[in-house]
């Protein structure tokens, strides 16, 4: 038997020493002061924090929607790595692909296009990122995937409806189906139940828990301790840093 130590798996997604300051004219508003975290394949990670603590900013940087600061000439404001590769070093085209294919986004507000049907909203981001041929075959595959998700989420009878005809919980289900239609490696969820009543919010969390059991990795930011209890692991964001302890 070998005495060699077991290899440590590369995290699926990790942030190391991420720093972010917003500038409003001459005013600087520091938000993140060296935040670090990692999420493994198939893990549900909750990041707890009060309103204004920088949770959304951290999530946006993880997903490539925002960038960490540049600090000095030879240093930067931290690094985000996906499967060991720094996303800050990706070309614009590769970064677009990362956001479109590897990451699914769910927000507190649903951001559905009012003129499109439920199924059209669910397939839109996946179709936008597709260029390979044969186009018709790929388009059909994406549509079938979206319909399967919507049916699993209890919206099979709503496929042709417009967002204005849906309840808040139904709209969030469409948003989740849209986020998962491209089979992303990880779902980034920003207060996904924050705009819903407790019962409907619980139903949304049940839905996410089922997708997690199917192997989906989730990073969810929230201020609700009850939601954090659903996760495999919980971290706390305070004073711009991530802590493993709930106590300051």
Regions found by a protein language model. Give the residues of each.
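Conserved ABC transporter NBD signature motif
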Residues: 71-86
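Conserved catalytic motifs of ABC-family nucleotide-binding domains
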Residues: 183
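Helix-to-loop junction immediately C-terminal to a conserved catalytic motif
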Residues: 63
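Short coil-to-helix segment of the ABC ATPase nucleotide-binding domain corresponding to the Q-loop/switch region
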Residues: 116-129
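ABC ATPase NBD coupling module
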Residues: 26-29, 87-104, 139-140, 213
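Catalytic Walker B motif of ABC-type/P-loop ATPase nucleotide-binding domains
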Residues: 187-190
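Conserved ABC ATPase signature
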Residues: 162-166, 170-172
């Amino acid at each position: 038997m070998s005495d060699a130590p077991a290899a440590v798996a590369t995290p699926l997604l990790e942030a190391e020493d991420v720093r972010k300051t917003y500038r409003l004219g001459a005013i600087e508003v520091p938000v993140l002061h060296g935040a670090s975290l990692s999420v493994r394949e198939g893990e549900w990670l909750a990041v707890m924090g009060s309103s204004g603590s920088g949770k959304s900013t951290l999530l946006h940087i993880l997903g490539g929607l925002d960038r960490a600061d540049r600090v000095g000439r030879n240093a930067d404001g931290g690094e985000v790595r996906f499967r060991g590769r720094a996303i800050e070093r990706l070309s614009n085209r590769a970064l677009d692909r990362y956001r479109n294919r590897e990451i699914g986004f769910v927000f507190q507000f649903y951001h559905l296009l009012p003129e499109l049907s439920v199924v059209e909203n669910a397939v839109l981001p996946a179709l936008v990122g597709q260029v390979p041929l044969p186009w018709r075959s790929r388009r059909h595959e994406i549509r079938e995937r979206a319909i399967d998700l919507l049916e699993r989420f209890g919206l099979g009878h709503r496929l042709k409806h417009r967002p204005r005809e849906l309840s808040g919980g139904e709209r969030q289900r469409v948003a989740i189906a849209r986020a998962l239609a491209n089979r992303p490696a990880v779902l980034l969820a920003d207060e996904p139940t924050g705009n819903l009543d407790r019962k409907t919010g619980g139903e949304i969390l049940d839905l996410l828990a089922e997708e997690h059991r199917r192997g989906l990795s989730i990073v969810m930011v929230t201020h609700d301790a009850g939601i954090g209890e659903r996760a495999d692991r919980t971290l706390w964001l305070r004073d711009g840093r991530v802590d493993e302890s709930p106590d300051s």
